[in-house]
Design a protein with these regions (language model features):
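Non-catalytic connector elements of ABC transporters
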Residues: 147-266
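Glycine-centered flexibility sites
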Residues: 34-35, 43, 108, 114, ...
Length: 266
């Protein structure tokens, strides 16, 4: 029994050292902060040396500052111990930062699985596209047109020819011209280009290195991220409420979804 007790004590102290909570071992739970209690709970699991560590929304009850701190702590922990983590969350930031692979579910049905980059760059449907990315992807009513064997998206009086990679995928799928939902991420929109859409500013958020423009575009809400280093003059004057802003995006940044929300490249 003594050997077992010594082994348990050894594991407890190793886990405490890993989580930097050795100084709290003699404290009662009520004397610990929320973040400290979370680390103690994780330590209890580590002591058992599990092959798989399941975490079910462990940060959901923490405030924003503590949540960010604990997110970094869990990432460090993953780097220290050789254990598979299964992490359940509704927070896409946690999913993107923690996961080597992400499984996105809706109503108990798997929508898509892959690396964070794969899901961000190639969402299988509208649900995944809207879930991954902050701010979320913009969606517009548009038409997929096909002229001389080339695909383009048409909206607001302009046509944007899709990239060669997207062309090849649509050709391989035998996709026909049709009404679509066009998805474009806020960071893939630019205030320059040959063919420009126009919208009006509802809200301008100065974030320091970037400005987030919340706009009305063809009666749809849209967000554009503009890097302040690319701007000249007063941001406040240029992006006042009601001001018109012209913008464009490239064919490689277009995500085309059919009437059922499926990405036509899949």
């Amino acid at each position: 029994m003594k050997g077992v007790k010594n082994e348990i004590d050894k594991r407890v102290r190793e886990a405490a050292a890993t989580l930097d909570i050795t100084q709290y071992l003699d404290r009662k739970p009520k004397a610990l902060s929320g973040g400290q209690r979370q680390r103690v709970a994780i330590g209890r699991a580590i002591v058992r040396e599990p092959k798989v560590l399941l975490m079910d929304e462990p940060l959901s009850n923490l405030d924003a500052k503590l949540r960010n701190q604990m997110r970094a702590e869990i990432i460090k922990l993953r780097q220290k111990i050789n254990t598979t983590f299964m992490y359940v969350t509704h927070d896409q930031t946690e999913a993107m930062t923690f996961g080597d692979r992400i499984v996105i579910m809706k109503d108990g049905v798997i929508q898509q699985s892959g690396t964070p980059q794969e899901l961000f760059d190639h969402p299988a449907n509208l649900f995944v596209a809207g879930f991954i990315g902050v701010p979320q992807m913009n969606f517009f009513d548009a038409e997929l047109v096909k002229k001389d064997g080339k695909y383009a998206v048409a909206l607001g009086g302009i046509e944007v020819v899709l990239s060669e990679d997207k062309q090849a995928k649509l050709v391989a799928k035998g996709v026909e011209a049709q009404a679509i939902t066009l998805g474009v991420r806020p960071e893939h929109i630019f205030l320059k280009g040959e063919q420009m859409l126009k919208g009006t500013v509802d809200v301008s958020e100065m974030m320091g290195s970037a400005v987030h423009l919340h706009m009305n575009v063809m009666s749809k809400d849209a967000v554009i991220i503009v890097q302040t280093i690319d701007l000249q003059g007063s941001v406040g004057e240029r992006f006042r409420y009601g001001n018109e802003v012209a913008f464009s995006f490239g064919g490689n940044e277009c995500h085309v979804f059919d009437k059922d929300g499926k990405n036509l490249e899949f």
